[in-house]
Design a protein with these regions (language model features):
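Short, aromatic-rich amphipathic segments at membrane interfaces
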Residues: 197-234
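Electron-transfer interface patches adjacent to heme c in soluble/periplasmic c-type cytochromes
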Residues: 70-143, 148-182, 189, 193-208
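N-terminal signal peptide c-region/cleavage motif recognized by signal peptidases
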Residues: 14-17
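Electrostatic cytochrome c docking/interface patches
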Residues: 20-45, 56-67, 223-231
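The canonical Cys-X-X-Cys-His
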Residues: 47-58, 215
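Stable alpha-helical elements in mature extracytoplasmic
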Residues: 36-39, 46-47, 107, 119-123, ...
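Sec-dependent signal peptide recognition
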Residues: 2-9
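Juxtamembrane interface at the cytosolic side of transmembrane helices
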Residues: 230-260
Length: 260
């Protein structure tokens, strides 16, 4: 038995080594709230305007999304449906997979479940990490997904981003450092950093971060549209169990009072 256990440990070492070497960059955490309908509505707007030219959400229906996000059906059809689809149709696109493979080398993936597959932190950082790279076919690369095979569709909002040197705040043990006397942030020059060229995008950095966060919030909802319903039902179940426990305890005392 001991030999088998040792053999399993040794067999797992190459996998652990691979995971350590290919873990990717450290991801900035993002707080996603799928109960925020305003954020999801803005995310839907960004998704339909910037993503649905190539990516579908074919496991969702326009009607279900409209109802969940509190959008009237006529508004959904006029602002988020550009293909002549009906309110009960799936959120598909007109591009055929065979054509997409010919044009791009591979068909763009469906994004209905991408937040479940990749995670919200990964999506948030990926969408903010495109930078100019003339050596790539679309002129851009990505810090989170090196040699990415898609263009930066949000460049008009974010602006042109390049890799260079800039002053960044000192971080020790995961905490940002400040001057103890003045309270100003302590900085140092770091290279291989992403920098947005001034006045090349329609949004400032804070606005763009919020726009991406809202898009990721919508994708998180799309990946699990019944999450809030499950949480609500779970609350009722726990309340029922707590209520039932009181009567179960009283019944137990009644059964055992003669024994004790």
């Amino acid at each position: 038995m001991k030999k088998l256990f040792v053999a399993l440990i040794l067999a797992a070492l190459p996998l652990l080594s691979f995971a350590a070497e290919h873990g990717g960059p450290e991801l900035e955490k993002v707080d996603i709230d799928v109960s925020d309908k305003a954020a999801m509505q803005d995310g839907l707007r960004t998704f339909t305007n910037y993503c649905m030219g190539c990516h579908s959400a074919k496991f969702q229906r326009y009607e279900r999304v409209a109802d969940d996000l509190g959008i009237p059906h006529e508004v959904m059809l006029s602002h988020s449906v550009f293909t002549g689809a009906k309110i009960g149709d799936h959120m598909s696109i007109g591009m055929q997979p065979a054509d997409a493979k010919t044009w791009f080398g591979a068909a763009p993936p469906d994004l209905t479940l991408v937040a479940r597959v990749r995670g919200t932190d990964w999506l948030y950082n990926y969408l903010k990490s495109f930078y100019e790279d003339p050596a790539r076919p679309y002129g851009v690369n990505n810090k989170v997904f090196p040699n990415v095979g898609m263009p930066n569709v949000l460049v008009g909002l974010q602006g042109r981003q390049v890799v260079g040197c800039k002053q960044v705040q000192v971080v020790e043990d995961g905490k940002k450092q400040y001057d103890p006397l003045t309270g100003t942030p302590l900085t140092h020059e770091a290279c291989d950093q992403l920098t947005i060229l001034p006045k090349t995008g329609t949004l400032n950095e804070e606005q763009f971060d919020e726009k991406v966060k809202n898009l990721v919030t919508f994708l998180a909802y799309s990946a699990n549209p019944v999450k809030l319903q499950h949480q609500r039902i779970g609350t009722y179940v726990l309340l029922y169990l707590a209520f039932f426990f009181v009567f179960a305890y009283l019944l137990k005392r009644e059964y055992w009072k003669d024994v004790h």
